[in-house]
Amino acid sequence: MIITVGGLAGTGTTTTAELLSEKLGIPFVSSGSIFRAMAEEKGMSVLEFSEFAESNDNIDKEIDKRQAELAKSSENLILEGRLSAYFVEADLKLWLMAPLDVRAQRISQRESKSVDVAKEEIKIREESEALRYLDIHNIDISNLDIYDLMINTDSFDPESITKIILTTLKVI
């Protein structure tokens, strides 16, 4: 079983993917972990590699390629990343969402910054990513038609979200 978990910053994609991995007993790989591995391969810090990636479209393409290869070579896998659903044949494609204020609050707590700073950073990052995804892959990240299940994570705690997904898996 291949599952993709996507969503914007602060929606709980990593938490959800980790819980699903634990409940289902199948591995979980995040696009972030692939990114960190690529930075290490280049002998760069994550920050240095992030700056390098901003001007090098091939980094995004390589992350997508590696996720697709992992999915093809795995019988059971959970892939977490904003674009995972676009590059992987999956049994279930999830999209998690939450209001901007909620996401900013979560990120402010996680990263020890003010809610206002977190909110501004989210807006800048998401605008930049939306343009990059459109430019590099011709993907409109706001079009959610590709997803099988969308969950507003503001409405449920992580355990409840996991139960919703596990229930969905029983009927597909």
Swiss-Prot record:
Record-annotated residues binding ATP? G7, L8, A9, G10, T11, G12, T13, T14, T15
Q: Which InterPro entries match?
A: Cyt_kin_arch, Cytidylate_kinase_dom, P-loop_NTPase
What GO cellular-component annotations does this UniProt entry give? cytoplasm
One GO term in the molecular function aspect is: CMP kinase activity
**SUPFAM superfamilies attached here?**
P-loop containing nucleoside triphosphate hydrolases
Q: Does the keyword Metal-binding apply?
A: no
- Name the record gives this protein: Cytidylate kinase
Q: Which organism is it from?
A: Methanobrevibacter smithii (strain ATCC 35061 / DSM 861 / OCM 144 / PS)
Q: What is the lineage of its organism?
A: Archaea, Methanobacteriati, Methanobacteriota, Methanomada group, Methanobacteria
